[in-house]
Every structure is written in structure tokens, then in C-alpha cells.
């Protein structure tokens, strides 16, 4: 990670850390870096989620892009994967998404996509950071016809919706509960599943700028669980604020997380001979039960650091077509270049329809080990160096010794927030509580801010 860019672009509290001034510079410098080798006038697509700060940052970012002669296509509210899809298929120079994903409304973020629809390489981010830190802005300042033009492009949303529908199956007879998190999916998910002939009920579809991810969506699926049981739905589908992740709920109201979703899609593709190299790419956060289920089906796995960008890097480098995270980021490279919650939902429901199986039946092959994750607020300067604190390193080693191989511990910094995450898996909830609580107590005593 760089000075400004984290694992998923630039993020911070809107108007405090991520200011309009910074957004303008990101537009100006990012646009320049991503389009300097273009032979024709560059085109950049810009979208946002439903946060109250989105329009403020959008205006500043677009001003920066226009100031270096870029033609900007303004998409309005659209899912993050919609941007990557449109950039790639419409042959744009780049795309920019204004969102803080699953974070609360006070935060926002800016992330760039290259012309291939993928997030930026580290080298490109460092080039933008160098311009941000330069003492003087020496970039060209065109005037008159050299300035960029702004184009409203609402057709982008319709094109993305049509793409999603073309990947699915007729869902006639399937009853679906949707939770669009008062976020970007609130403008598209209803249309997509109605076009697929599903019988739908929707919550989290009334964004007001402040209620995005607020007790709702993929990080808060409790309301969706209740809705599924109340409406006797076959499946519940919960997206996050920018709709790049999906958490599902089965017909009994039980959570089906990213691990189980990846297993279901991976097994389906494997049985059809469509799973590239018969391998799924996942992260260190995936549950032991997920690994055991893959082993039982003869499916291979590759494990990366946490963050969908690392999953995508592994997939691109070695030619895999399915990967993701327990949190619900699922990348299906045959269709899109980034995690896509609505695409994943369409594929999951297609599998249910084609197999005639309930979601609980499809997910039953994965027996999840009890897992506990605690987030501890720490100073940003300490979260990367926690393992250098002797007391923390010692307690982790002690707990791992007590596990004797029957479980695992993972202590890692958040890529987007000032948090240290302490996670453990073990055969019982009592053991998990003991391991996590013991380590967390030491972390709080040594470097915690709470």
C-alpha cells in the first residue's frame, strides 16, 4: 500500500480526509497517468454510490479530469462492477468509482480502473502518488477546445443490467428476497431479477444519502434473514454499498457466506468441466471447512493475502476463472474483472434453477468451523507493526501451541481502516472464544485505542 492508496483505492472520512481538493487532484493526476499514452481524446467513465458526499466528490473529481482534457462520461449511481464492465466493453481509457463499499456513510473512497477493467497496478498508483506529493503541479493546462467535455450517460446502467440478465436463467417460480443496502444495487437489482421472471421482495431500496449499509446489507443480514422466513422465500440476496459483494440467506434463514457461495459455483463449474485448472483462488480468511469441502470434491485451491485485488492478481497471472473471499467478493472472470455481487447472485440462482436443489442443499457440503473475528481500533502507524510487539507475538505463539494444529489463528491489519483484526477457528465455539479473547486482551493492552 502507498501513502494515499490502500488495498481498494483512496478512502477516508468524506470532507475531512477525502476532501474535494484531494478528489480534484486525484481526477487531474489520475486521469493524466491513465491517459497519457492515448492517441485520441481520452474517455473516462465516472460512477458513485448513494452516499451524501458522493455528488460533492463526483463534481470535484470530474473537474480534475476535465482540466487535463479528458472527456468524462457521467454514469450516476451504479455498482462498482458496472464501471469495470462498461470501461472494458465500451473501450474507455479508464473508469473511476466513488464509494467506500461496505463502510458507513461518513466515509467515501475513490478507486480507478484501467482500460482493461481491472484495478490499477501498484506502479500506476505510485505514479499518481508522486504527482500528489510534488511541490508544483506541472501538468498541461489546456484551454478552449483542449478542455474535456462532460457527457451524461444514463444508458450505462441499462447496458449493465442487460449484461447481467444475459448471464442468467429464467427464474420463474423462484421466490427471492433482495437487500440492496440502500446503496448502488438499489437502482438495478430489482430490474435484473424482474427481467429474469423471479418473484421478488426488496428491502434497503430507499437511499437517503445517510442510510447506506446502516443496519442493512451484506454486513448486516439480520433483516434479510427475517424477511426470507416471513415471506417463505427460496433465497435471500444481500449486497453491500457498491454491490461488489454478496451474502446469501437460504430458505431456512441461515447465512450462506462467500466461502459457501464459491464452493457452490466452483463445484457446478467443475462438474461441467468449466472451472479453469479445476482451481478456486481464495484468501487466508477462508474457513477450514471450505478447504476440506474442496478437498473432498478434488478441487484445488490457491491462497492469497486478504483483499480481492490479490485474488484477481493470482487469477490473472495463472489463468484461473473463479476466486473470492469469505466476505462475499466473488470474481467470475468469464464474465467480469472484479467482484460483482449482482452477477454472483444471478449465477447462484441459475444453479438453483438448473439443479432443482434448495440453497441449503447446495451449501450443505461445506461444514463451517466456528470462527470468531474481533476488530481492535489501533493507530494506523501501529497496525502494520503489531507483530513486532513482543507480548503480542508471544501470546499468539502460545495459543497456536495449544491448538496443536486443530485450528488456526490469523492476526492482520485492515487494508482500509485503523483496525487490527484478530481471527481464530477451532472445533468448538468455546475454544474459539478463548483463543480470540486471550489475544485481543493483550493487543488492547499493548496498542489498543479503545
UniProtKB/Swiss-Prot annotation:
Task: Copy out the cofactor comment.
Answer: Binds 1 Mg(2+) ion per subunit.
Please name the GO terms that the record assigns under molecular function. magnesium ion binding; phosphoglucosamine mutase activity; phosphomannomutase activity
The record's keywords, sorted A to Z, are: Isomerase, Magnesium, Metal-binding, Phosphoprotein
Tell me which EC number(s) this protein carries: 5.4.2.10
Organism name? Streptococcus equi subsp. equi (strain 4047)
This protein's gene is called glmM
GO terms (BP aspect): carbohydrate metabolic process; peptidoglycan biosynthetic process; UDP-N-acetylglucosamine biosynthetic process
Where are the active-site residues found?
101
> Which PROSITE patterns does this one have?
PGM_PMM (PS00710)
Keyword Isomerase included in the entry's annotation: yes
Which reaction(s) does its UniProt entry say it catalyses? alpha-D-glucosamine 1-phosphate = D-glucosamine 6-phosphate
Q: Which protein family is named in the record? A: Belongs to the phosphohexose mutase family.
User: What cofactor is needed?
Assistant: Mg(2+)
Q: Spell out where the chain crosses the membrane.
A: none
Q: What does this protein do?
A: Catalyzes the conversion of glucosamine-6-phosphate to glucosamine-1-phosphate.
Which residues are annotated with the PTM Phosphoserine?
101
Q: What is this protein called?
A: Phosphoglucosamine mutase
- Top-rank taxon of the source lineage equals Bacteria
Pfam families from the UniProt entry: PGM_PMM_I, PGM_PMM_II, PGM_PMM_III, PGM_PMM_IV
Amino acid at each position: 500500500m502507498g501513502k494515499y492508496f490502500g488495498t481498494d483505492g483512496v478512502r477516508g472520512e468524506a470532507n475531512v480526509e477525502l476532501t474535494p481538493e484531494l478528489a480534484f487532484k486525484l481526477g487531474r493526476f489520475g486521469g493524466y497517468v491513465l491517459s497519457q499514452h492515448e492517441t485520441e481524446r481520452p474517455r473516462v467513465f465516472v460512477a458513485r454510490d448513494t452516499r451524501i458526499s458522493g455528488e460533492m466528490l463526483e463534481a470535484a473529481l470530474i473537474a480534475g479530469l476535465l482540466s487535463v482534457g479528458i472527456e468524462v462520461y457521467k454514469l450516476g449511481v451504479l455498482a462498482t462492477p458496472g464501471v469495470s464492465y462498461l470501461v472494458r466493453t465500451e473501450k474507455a481509457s479508464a473508469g473511476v468509482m466513488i464509494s467506500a463499499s461496505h463502510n458507513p456513510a461518513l466515509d467515501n473512497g475513490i478507486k480507478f480502473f484501467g482500460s482493461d477493467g481491472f484495478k490499477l497496478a501498484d506502479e500506476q498508483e505510485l505514479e499518481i502518488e508522486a504527482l500528489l506529493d510534488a511541490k508544483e503541479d506541472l501538468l498541461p493546462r489546456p484551454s478552449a477546445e483542449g478542455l474535456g467535455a462532460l457527457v451524461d450517460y444514463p444508458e450505462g446502467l441499462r447496458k449493465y443490467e442487460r449484461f447481467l440478465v444475459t448471464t442468467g436463467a429464467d427464474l420463474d417460480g423462484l421466490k427471492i428476497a433482495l437487500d440492496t443496502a440502500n446503496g448502488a444495487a438499489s437502482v438495478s437489482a430489482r430490474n435484473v431479477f424482474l427481467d429474469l421472471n423471479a418473484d421478488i421482495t426488496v428491502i434497503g431500496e430507499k437511499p437517503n444519502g445517510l442510510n447506506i449499509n446502516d443496519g442493512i446489507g451484506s454486513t448486516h443480514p439480520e433483516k434479510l434473514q427475517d424477511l426470507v422466513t416471513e415471506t417463505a422465500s427460496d433465497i435471500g440476496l444481500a449486497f453491500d454499498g457498491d454491490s461488489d459483494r454478496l451474502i446469501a440467506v437460504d430458505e431456512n434463514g441461515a447465512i450462506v457466506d462467500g466461502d459457501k457461495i464459491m464452493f457452490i459455483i466452483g463445484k457446478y463449474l467443475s462438474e461441467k468441466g468449466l472451472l479453469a485448472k479445476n482451481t478456486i483462488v481464495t484468501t487466508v480468511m477462508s474457513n477450514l471447512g471450505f478447504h476440506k469441502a474442496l478437498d473432498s470434491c478434488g478441487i484445488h485451491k490457491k491462497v492469497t493475502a486478504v483483499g480481492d485485488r490479490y485474488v484477481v492478481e493470482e487469477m490473472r497471472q495463472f489463468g484461473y476463472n473463479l476466486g473470492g473471499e469469505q466476505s462475499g467478493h466473488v470474481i467470475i472472470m468469464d464474465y467480469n474483472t472484479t467482484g460483482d455481487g449482482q452477477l454472483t447472485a444471478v449465477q447462484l440462482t441459475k444453479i438453483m434453477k438448473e439443479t432443482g436443489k434448495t440453497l441449503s442443499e447446495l451449501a450443505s457440503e461445506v461444514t463451517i468451523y466456528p470462527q470468531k473475528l474481533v476488530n481492535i481500533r489501533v493507530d494506523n502507524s501501529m497496525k502494520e507493526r503489531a507483530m513486532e510487539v513482543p507480548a503480542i507475538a508471544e501470546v499468539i505463539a502460545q495459543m497456536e501451541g495449544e491448538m496443536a494444529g486443530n485450528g488456526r489463528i490469523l492476526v492482520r491489519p485492515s487494508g482500509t481502516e485503523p483496525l487490527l483484526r484478530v481471527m481464530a477457528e477451532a472445533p468448538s465455539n468455546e475454544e474459539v472464544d478463548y483463543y480470540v479473547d486471550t489475544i485481543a486482551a493483550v493487543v488492547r493492552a499493548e496498542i489498543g485505542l479503545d
